[in-house]
Curated annotation (Swiss-Prot):
Transmembrane segments: none annotated. GO terms for biological process: cell surface receptor protein tyrosine kinase signaling pathway; modulation of chemical synaptic transmission; negative regulation of neuron apoptotic process; nerve development; nerve growth factor signaling pathway; neuron projection morphogenesis. It holds the Pfam family NGF. Its main location: secreted. Keywords: Cleavage on pair of basic residues, Disulfide bond, Endosome, Glycoprotein, Growth factor, Metalloenzyme inhibitor, Metalloprotease inhibitor, Protease inhibitor, Secreted, Signal. This is Beta-nerve growth factor. It comes from the Eukaryota. Residues 19-121 form a propeptide. It comes from Pongo pygmaeus (Bornean orangutan). InterPro entries: Cystine-knot_cytokine (IPR029034), Nerve_growth_factor-like (IPR020408), Nerve_growth_factor-rel (IPR002072), Nerve_growth_factor_bsu (IPR020425), Nerve_growth_factor_bsu_mml (IPR020437), Nerve_growth_factor_CS (IPR019846). It is found in: Secreted; Endosome lumen.
Length: 241
């Protein structure tokens, strides 16, 4: 709303400077035609109508989108060293069902740019044979609202949420895995002899290549994301008589 206000003020000031205050200030043969004032008035009326009809929130969102609209060359995604099975650029959210968690899916006829050959990922507890259990319960989800992350140098960087590729807006998704519960059972990890061991489940991390902001330009960086849930063991102190 403030940008439209400044535009109206600028146009108004230009009109004041051009308006003749008296006949003596206007050189002979250089009078401003009436059509100029009519056109200026029409432009001001149109701008006022748009300002009244457009919500302030919509204007702010549009301006923010223009400042964050980063165009990326699609040839960047053809470099094998920049591909990661845990990073995906897509126009729509990836499927969440366990039986459709395919990284090679296509949305709206356009395949993701950084598609890989890894077939499926389960978004819930992995499937085991009868009688087999996992020592820790994990949950895996596609994260599409990541704004900041820690890079490989330990610095906090800004992650690009959306990029413009071939005039289409692609969102950057990260496939993250974390522990569902640090203690799946009362004693800690499942199946651990609590008489001799202390145990608990913890989320581990790895670094993946992602598009981040470097000043006013997009840049590839290694950022840390959650990738696994493991059991940590420590031997209990032996009590001697």
């Amino acid at each position: 709303m403030s940008m439209l206000f400044y535009t109206l003020i600028t146009a108004f000031l230009i009109g004041i400077q051009a308006e003749p205050h008296s006949e003596s200030n206007v050189p002979a043969g250089h009078t401003i035609p009436q059509a100029h004032w009519t056109k200026l008035q029409h432009s001001l009326d149109t701008a006022l109508r748009r300002a009244r009809s457009t919500p302030a929130a919509a204007i702010a969102a549009r301006v923010a989108g223009q400042t964050c609209n980063i165009t990326v060359d699609p040839r960047l995604f053809k470099k094998r060293r920049l591909r990661s099975p845990r990073v995906l650029f897509s126009t729509q959210p990836p499927p969440e069902a366990a039986d459709t968690q395919d990284l090679d899916f296509e949305v709206g006829g356009a395949a993701p740019f950084n598609r890989t050959h890894r077939s499926k990922r389960s978004s819930s507890h992995p499937i085991f044979h009868r009688g087999e259990f996992s020592v820790c319960d994990s949950v895996s989800v596609w994260v599409g609202d990541k704004t900041t992350a820690t890079d490989i140098k330990g610095k906090e960087v800004m992650v690009l949420g959306e990029v413009n590729i071939n005039n289409s807006v692609f969102k950057q998704y990260f496939f993250e895995t974390k522990c569902r519960d640090p203690n799946p059972v009362d004693s800690g990890c499942r199946g651990i002899d609590s008489k001799h061991w202390n145990s608990y489940c913890t989320t581990t991390h790895t670094f993946v290549k992602a598009l981040t902001m470097d000043g006013k330009q997009a840049a590839w960086r290694f950022i840390r994301i959650d990738t696994a849930c493991v059991c940590v063991l420590s031997r209990k102190a032996v009590r001697r008589a």
